[in-house]
Design a protein with these regions (language model features):
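Bacterial N-terminal signal peptides that target proteins for export
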Residues: 1-7
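Serine/proline-rich low-complexity intrinsically disordered segments, especially terminal tails, linkers
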Residues: 6, 18-21
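Hydrophobic h-region of N-terminal signal peptides that target proteins for export
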Residues: 11-19
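Cell-envelope and extracellular/periplasmic
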Residues: 21-206
Length: 206
């Protein structure tokens, strides 16, 4: 079954256990680096979830920036020597400012983080730190939104098959493996295989 259909089923399953409170909305938080930054939710993602859940039942927030490591979102991150980088969690704070403004006064039925990132960490050789950071980011978001961690959905876009030989990005395959492992670790997590998108074509097929 294509990933798009599996993802659709996953999202429906996620919201099926959500709060049934009247007027409650389903919150989708889209973040990551370049591929997420270039993504235009209004072209496909938002129409799809609105069709499935109702136009007035969905809140979609996107905030992403190309070329960034995960430590610009996950605040406890430390490098292999135990040092803290200068830019730590600043993009997470920027994202959360948007999220809090969007949900102010709203009743929330479900929350799902849609994450497309990992290239920079693979390039820097930080793959061994990525599992803790990925799980930590999910937990950090759940805590800050006062949401049960086990109920917060997590859709992870896996790195494509761009550098399977680890020639330019020494931890490319390691980060891919970590993303798969994390996605398999919880029923509320889902992996999107992006290997078929590494064809050089734009969203217009050119």
């Amino acid at each position: 079954m294509p990933d798009s259909k599996l993802l659709y089923i996953f999202l429906l399953a996620l919201v099926s256990i959500a709060s049934g409170e009247k007027d409650a909305k389903h919150l989708f938080i889209l973040s990551g680096q370049s591929n997420m930054q270039a993504h235009r939710p209004d072209e496909a993602f938002t129409p799809a979830v609105e069709k499935a859940l109702g136009k007035d039942k969905v809140i979609v927030i996107q905030d992403a920036l190309g070329g960034q490591p995960i430590h610009r979102w996950w605040k406890p991150w430390r490098d292999p020597e135990g040092q803290s980088p200068e830019q730590l969690g600043d993009l997470y704070d920027r994202l959360m400012n948007k999220v809090r403004a969007a949900i102010d006064g709203q009743k929330i039925a479900s929350i799902c983080l849609v994450w497309m990132q990992g290239e920079r960490d693979a390039r820097m050789g930080w793959g061994k730190l990525y599992e803790e950071a990925l799980l930590g980011l999910h937990a950090q978001l759940a805590k800050d939104l006062n949401w049960k961690k086990k109920d917060l959905g997590f859709v992870i876009g896996r790195l494509s098959d761009f550098d399977m030989g680890n020639q330019k990005y020494p931890h490319w395959t390691l980060v891919r493996e970590v993303q798969q492992k994390v996605a398999d670790s919880h029923p509320q997590f889902f992996l999107v295989n992006t290997d078929d998108l590494n064809d050089g074509l734009s969203r217009k097929g050119k």
